[in-house]
Structures are given as C-alpha cells and as structure tokens.
Amino acid sequence: MYDATFSLPGHTMIEHSLWVPLDRFGALSRFAGDETAAIPEKIELFAREYVRHGNKKLPRLVYFQGGPGFGGPRMAPIGSWLDTALNHYRVVLLDERGTGRSHPIEAQAVSAVGPTPVQAAFISCFRQDSIAADAEDLRLAFGGEPWAVLGQSFGGFVVTACLSQAPQGLSEAFITAGLPSVEGHADDVYRLTYAQTDVRNREFFARYPGDEPVAWSVAKHLADVEERLPTGERLTPGRFRQIGICLGRSYGLEQLHFLLEDPFWTVRGARRLRPQFLDRIGAQVSLAPAPLYGVMHEAIYAQASTGATAWSADRIRGEFPQFRLPDVAAGAAAESELEAEG
C-alpha cells in the first residue's frame, strides 16, 4: 500500500492507495482470454483518512458513500458529521471502486473493454459485494484491527455486504437510510417508490401551487422547441421531469421550488429558457459526476432468489397512470393532454 501524508490545521490527512483484484467473483471467467484482454486484472483503490490531532490511537471508522457511483466526500473545511466522528475515530473516506480515484468508470472506458456482453460483465465487477471485499483488503492492509463501518443510503447496502462477507472485521456497523431487503424483488421497491413519489408531488404542488403551471409550461415548451444544456445535450421533456429526484430529499420541496424560478425570457421576440435556468437544470439531471448511478441503480435491488430485475423501474411505471409519459411525436399537444387529465 502507498501512503501520502499531509498536515492540515488540527488534522492529519493520509491518502492511501492499494491494488485490488478487479474480478473478485468470476464475472469475466466465461469469456476467452482475448475477449477480455483490454480489462486489467487489478485496479487501484483509493481512500482518504483523517486523524484529529491528539487522536492517533483511536480506532478506525470507514465511510461508504451513497449512490451507487459517488466517490467519498471531499470536505473542506471539515464539518457536518465528519467533525463529530473525528472526536471518536480515525475516519477513512473510501472511494468505492468505479468512483473518485478508485478506477473511475465512464462511458468511453466501458466501451473500450469489448462487445456488449463483456461490458455487462465488466460493470458487474463494481457491485456492493466487490466494494465490501475491497474494504476488507484495506482493513487488512491497515494491520487487521476490526473497524467500524458507516453507510449512507447505498452505503448501507455495502455495510450489509460487509456484515455478510467479513463480520470478523467489524467492531460496529451504522446504517443511515439504506437497509436492503434480503428476499424482496426490485418490483416491490419501485411500487413503493412510485406511490411515495405521487404523494410527494401532491405535497409539492399543495405547498407551491404556482409551480404547477410553470412546470407544465416548461414541459410543453421543450416538446416543441430545441433547448440545449450547457454541456450540449438537448433538454427533453422527459429529462426535465428527472428534476423530481429532489422530492426524495429532506428539503427537496424547497430545492425544486428554487429550480423552477423564472425559467423564461424573450430573445429577439422568441420565448426561450434562460441560460441560468438551463444551468440549474443541467447540474441537477447530469450523471457526469456519477455515471455508474444510471447504470447500476436498479441492479442494487437484485436478488439471486428473485432473478433479473428486467427493467423493473420502467415496467412498474406502467402500473401508475399518473406517471404515463406523453407521445413524443405529438409535441406540446401531448403534454397539454396530460395536463388536462390532472
């Protein structure tokens, strides 16, 4: 393991790098060697450790980020939960494989490994079971003392994988809002998600009734007028609807309200979306910081006992007519039809 140590006000920061196997569970073993020649046997795992001055002898706690697809938090200055945790632990912020500095994954890298079946097998090497195995290798590299684990959201799925695969390495386990089922199908998760999303939509428009006509105006405009995000992609009505992810957050109603502020202006007599509005929406819907989120989010709910998820989120949406999508070819007229349905 390679370490680099830095002195910060009140803290020592240590950056750890460790080489670990890519394919821990044989996902690539069914392919011939020449089919996987572009795939490395090992990848570099990165973690950043913080130690408060005077607390060098405290036990370690490793933090697993939510997602999937997001790296460990980069905090400057140190605050929030980390500030409190450092009074009790040396805290290790792990970049889970495929994120941050731990062999980050993006579309070009996946395309380069081979044909679609190889790509799918490659992506499967970045699940929570492999992340838990990486963490165990890191713990052993630190000397093997049991440590505490803390998982937020998807990080809780990693914690349960650690409890299953290497309980001997754990002194404590903390989970915040991420406890997976051991037998339920992804369909069950998405039925609950759509039902709760409907509730949150109603809460939002009850609190901010003026935002409902604004949202419909934007959707209808996007159905007929080409608008581009700062990154160059076209903003479609379907992608605009993805800002509803805010509704899953504690203060999401306010965040969504702020996103919808003052979307339009007039340019040479034409009604267009403001650049500032497009920038806010682009930042909200972009998966550029965490491309694995879009690819693997449904897969984290998979169970060996229930089989493939089979595009569960899309299938289950069909059970909820309030989330029916309009006919894209019909343009704004289809959006108006949906609006009239209430």
Residue ranges and their predicted role:
Residues 226-342:
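Alpha/beta-hydrolase fold active-site neighborhood
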